[in-house]
């Protein structure tokens, strides 16, 4: 009787052992699946957030290409466009010329440094744009010729007339002088503020690109 009972319990233990192993294996698989999902979710969230400063920079560059100053300002953390104050690009007389120039700008994002912990990033754009140095040179040369002719006739131009004549000459020369492209890399610091990613400030390099490497045409002739 005792021998039979012992054999019975031994057989029962043998039967239970594989079941325990299967349960452990199943539990491990579930744990690994959950772990993979958590990691994938975290990585997905990181890359989703990482795209936000890149998209902000692209929007900024598109507004820059369209000369949409209000659009650029809305994407600036500083909300300050004063870097354009001394640039010809803000003059209504030159709007048509600079729009044609900036439409030819192209860019691509080449590098991104993203810090999710403190909500900062830096996005580097490689920009190809018109170098207007030759257009400027031709414009000023022609303008000075016309000024000499005007002076000999005893006439003088008002500041408004001077600006308008320069604007007309710029458009004429831009249609006859062959486009000369140049390239540059600009790194934009981007920061998260109130749930939105914004460019920190309007920098001098961006102004130079938008102005086609021009300084100030009236400064050149004064």
Model-inferred region functions:
Residues 1-77, 123:
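Gram-positive cell-envelope targeting signals
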Residues 4-7, 12-15, 55, 77-78, ...:
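C-terminal or late-domain output modules
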Residues 23, 107-109, 121-125, 188-190, ...:
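Hydrophobic beta-strand residues in large extracellular and virion-surface proteins
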Residues 50-53, 65, 87, 91, ...:
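Solvent-exposed, acidic/flexible segments
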Residues 53-60, 68, 93-97, 140, ...:
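Stable alpha-helical elements in mature extracytoplasmic
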Residues 74-149:
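Short solvent-exposed beta->alpha transition segments
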Residues 93-95, 165-172:
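Short Pro/Gly-enriched beta-strand edge/turn motifs at strand-loop
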Residues 142-164, 175-221:
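Short beta-strand edge/turn micro-motifs at domain boundaries
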């Amino acid at each position: 009787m005792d021998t039979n009972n012992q054999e019975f319990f031994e057989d029962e233990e043998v039967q239970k052992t594989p079941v325990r192993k299967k349960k452990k294996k199943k539990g491990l698989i579930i744990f690994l699946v959950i772990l993979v999902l958590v990691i994938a979710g975290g990585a997905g969230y990181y890359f989703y957030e990482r795209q936000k400063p890149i998209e902000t920079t692209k929007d900024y560059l598109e507004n820059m290409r369209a000369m949409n100053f209000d659009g650029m300002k809305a994407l600036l953390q500083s909300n300050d466009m004063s870097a354009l104050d001394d640039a010809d690009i803000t003059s209504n007389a030159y709007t048509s010329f600079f729009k044609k120039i900036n439409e030819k700008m192209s860019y691509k994002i080449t590098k991104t440094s993203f810090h999710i912990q403190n909500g900062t990033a830096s996005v580097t754009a490689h920009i190809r744009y018109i170098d207007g140095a030759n257009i400027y040179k031709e414009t000023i040369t022609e303008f000075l010729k016309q000024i000499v002719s005007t002076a000999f006739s005893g006439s003088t131009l008002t500041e408004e007339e001077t600006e308008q004549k320069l604007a007309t000459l710029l458009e004429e020369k831009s249609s006859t002088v062959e486009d000369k492209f140049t390239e540059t890399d600009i790194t934009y610091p981007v920061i998260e503020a109130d749930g939105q990613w914004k460019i920190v400030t309007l920098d001098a390099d961006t102004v130079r690109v938008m102005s086609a490497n021009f300084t100030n045409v009236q400064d050149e002739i004064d």
